[in-house]
């Protein structure tokens, strides 16, 4: 994960101080790309301990098309608590857009299912895209999508994916995002009988919050360790039938966690 630490150092060294929606303040750069070869290991940050259970449950929750945090609460995942209303609803965020994008005539589009069909039946397509950035529903969302748009690419039975992330919290959010989309790639590769290729991450406004700077400097003192390996213990009938127990991680040997406040 040296790419991640390089980006963190770049933000610290080259970033500009900016105000932001949360009122916290950031140091920010605009535009950067990283590439992770998933054949070399699962890209979960080792320079601090990451909560893989939350990453897995959040992705399974997205895949269900769910936008209420009840499922997350049942599984002791609290990462969306601050944005939910009294009923637990977050509005039409990621899961709704991935699985049930509303059309002007009142129908719904399951973008993920359509993309899976293309991956299986027309893998040379340039339309294997899923978007969460639904302009017509942004004002109904508790939080506008940060990881907004992703595209798949297949060559010689090898699956790659590129994500565009319009807003990136480097210290807290980015390790989750990299691991989450890499996990999704593992699942789709299994479902489609593909080899694993590259996860390509492209960022827009890439920032460290002003109350994360000390934590970032601490993390940069730590030498990255070998990447762990993700195992999927069974092959479900579809992408939407995975359970938490289907995943295990081997040889994850991180440094201790580094606590930091979440900007709301």
UniProtKB/Swiss-Prot annotation:
**Reactions accelerated catalytically:** dUMP + (6R)-5,10-methylene-5,6,7,8-tetrahydrofolate = 7,8-dihydrofolate + dTMP
Q: Matching CDD domains, A to Z? A: TS_Pyrimidine_HMase
Q: Does the keyword Transferase apply?
A: yes
Q: Which GO terms describe its molecular function?
A: thymidylate synthase activity
| Biological processes per GO annotation | dTMP biosynthetic process; dTTP biosynthetic process; methylation
Residues recorded as binding (6R)-5,10-methylene-5,6,7,8-tetrahydrofolate, renumbered to this chain, are 51, 169, 263
Q: Which UniProt keywords apply?
A: Cytoplasm, Methyltransferase, Nucleotide biosynthesis, Transferase
Q: Looking at its record, which EC class is this enzyme? A: transferase
* Protein EC: 2.1.1.45
Q: Which residues form the active site?
A: 146 (nucleophile)
> Under the cellular component aspect of Gene Ontology, which terms does the record hold?
cytosol
Q: Report residues binding dUMP.
A: 21, 126-127, 166-169, 177, 207-209
Q: In which pathway does it act?
A: Pyrimidine metabolism; dTTP biosynthesis
Q: Where in the cell is it found?
A: Cytoplasm
Return the NCBIfam families for the record: PRK01827.1-3, PRK01827.1-5, thym_sym
Mind telling me which HAMAP family this protein's record contains?
Thymidy_synth_bact
Entry function? Catalyzes the reductive methylation of 2'-deoxyuridine-5'-monophosphate (dUMP) to 2'-deoxythymidine-5'-monophosphate (dTMP) while utilizing 5,10-methylenetetrahydrofolate (mTHF) as the methyl donor and reductant in the reaction, yielding dihydrofolate (DHF) as a by-product. This enzymatic reaction provides an intracellular de novo source of dTMP, an essential precursor for DNA biosynthesis.
What does the annotation say about its assembly with partners?
Homodimer.
- Give the protein's recorded name: Thymidylate synthase
Species name for this entry?
Hamiltonella defensa subsp. Acyrthosiphon pisum (strain 5AT)
Q: Which gene encodes it?
A: thyA
């Amino acid at each position: 994960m040296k790419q991640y630490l390089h980006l963190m150092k770049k933000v610290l060294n080259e970033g500009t101080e900016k105000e932001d929606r949360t009122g916290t303040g950031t140091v920010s750069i605009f535009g950067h790309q990283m590439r992770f070869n998933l054949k070399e290991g699962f890209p979960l940050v080792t320079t601090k301990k990451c909560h893989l259970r939350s990453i897995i449950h959040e992705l399974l929750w997205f895949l269900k098309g769910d936008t209420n945090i009840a499922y997350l609460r049942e599984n002791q995942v609290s990462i969306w608590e601050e944005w939910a209303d009294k009923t637990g609803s977050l509005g039409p965020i990621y899961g709704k857009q991935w699985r049930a994008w509303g059309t002007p005539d009142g129908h719904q589009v399951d973008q993920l299912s359509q993309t899976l069909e293309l991956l299986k039946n027309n893998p040379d397509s340039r339309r294997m895209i899923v978007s969460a950035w639904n302009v017509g529903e942004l004002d109904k969302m508790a939080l506008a999508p940060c990881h907004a748009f992703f595209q798949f690419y297949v060559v010689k039975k090898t699956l790659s994916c590129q994500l565009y992330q319009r807003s990136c919290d480097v210290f807290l959010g980015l390790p989750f995002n990299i691991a989450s989309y890499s996990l999704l790639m593992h699942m789709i590769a299994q479902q489609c009988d593909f080899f694993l290729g590259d996860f390509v991450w492209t960022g827009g406004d890439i920032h460290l919050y002003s109350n994360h700077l000390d934590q970032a400097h601490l993390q940069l003192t730590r030498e990255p360790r070998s990447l762990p390996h993700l195992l999927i213990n069974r092959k479900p009938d579809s992408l939407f039938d995975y359970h938490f127990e289907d995943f295990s991680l081997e040889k994850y040997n991180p440094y201790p966690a580094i606590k930091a406040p979440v900007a709301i």
